[in-house]
């Protein structure tokens, strides 16, 4: 929350064009401190374009941003980062053969000494890395081990802890669970809750409602560059979110159209079965989700 009780980050009427292609059209959303806003949509919905405008990679052609209640114009990623908007992309910007602590401070290396005798402060870097990861509930065996030896979920957690350490007020996570298995996705979701509990506004980009719903407080659904739905958690259950995301309504409508055209041919029946399978899958997957309660702190 801002000092006046409003959203930490607010986007109003953002549009972005690439020639004649409309990537975003009149998109509005907000992010509150200590909440997870889930930005959902299929491939090509406009999620990546929106986060690149939020993080300063692209400049919007229309609309405005308010950060902490003040109008902002992000001309570069550094502008956004200096205001406290940090983005963790899928590739994580890590070097696998470097140690965890070197990756943690990559680009912001701490030094000691002066003049020609200035050198990397290894002791501070290793101690800080271990301490910051511990605050997030991340237990690493050795800060000197190459970051490439960590699992995908552990590397994501290191990137999240790094952003938090360097003062992120808004943390944008670009599909952090997309390439992970069930167990490692659960690890990342737990650390997202940890960041939220530390008062950070989190934007969680995903195309998987089963990953978003357990941690989300607010859900914004994009479709073809426009906001298709905007709901608080208490307004929409997981089944409704899946229905909006997966096109269950479209499948059923198409089945009716085919039924009228082909007098109930096999294509219509197949589509109806697909819609029923989608509903059944909602229940079975929900049973495998990580716990929705607060994540354990550093002490377990």
Model-assigned labels for residue ranges:
Residues 285-300:
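Long, low-complexity, intrinsically disordered segments
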Residues 2-281:
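Glycine-rich phosphate-binding loops of nucleotide-dependent enzymes
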């Amino acid at each position: 929350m801002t000092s006046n009780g409003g959203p930490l980050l607010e986007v109003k009427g953002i549009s972005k064009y690439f020639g004649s292609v409309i990537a975003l059209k009149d998109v509005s959303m907000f992010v509150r401190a200590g909440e997870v806003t889930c930005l959902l949509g299929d491939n090509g919905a406009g999620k990546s374009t929106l986060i690149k405008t939020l993080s300063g990679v692209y400049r919007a052609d229309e609309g405005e941003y308010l950060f902490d209640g003040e109008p902002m114009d992000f001309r570069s990623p550094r502008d956004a980062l200096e205001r406290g908007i940090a983005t963790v992309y899928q590739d994580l910007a890590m070097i696998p053969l470097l140690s965890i602590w070197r990756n943690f401070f990559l680009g912001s290396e701490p030094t000691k000494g002066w003049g020609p005798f200035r050198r990397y402060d290894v002791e501070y870097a290793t101690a800080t890395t271990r301490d910051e990861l511990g605050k997030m509930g991340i237990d690493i065996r050795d800060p000197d081990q190459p970051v490439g030896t960590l699992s995908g979920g552990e590397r994501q957690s290191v990137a999240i802890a790094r952003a938090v350490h360097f003062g992120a007020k808004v943390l944008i996570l670009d599909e952090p669970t997309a390439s992970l298995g069930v167990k490692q996705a659960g690890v990342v979701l737990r650390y997202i809750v940890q960041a939220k509990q530390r008062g950070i506004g989190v934007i969680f980009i995903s195309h998987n409602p089963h990953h978003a719903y357990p941690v989300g407080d607010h859900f914004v659904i994009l479709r073809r560059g426009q906001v298709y739905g905007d709901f608080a958690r208490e307004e929409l259950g997981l089944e409704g979110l899946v229905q909006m995301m997966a096109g269950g309504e479209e499948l059923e409508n198409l089945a009716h159209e085919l039924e009228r055209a082909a007098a109930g041919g096999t294509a219509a029946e197949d589509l109806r079965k697909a819609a029923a399978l989608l509903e059944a899958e909602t229940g079975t997957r929900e049973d495998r989700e990580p716990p929705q309660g607060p994540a354990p702190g550093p002490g377990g």
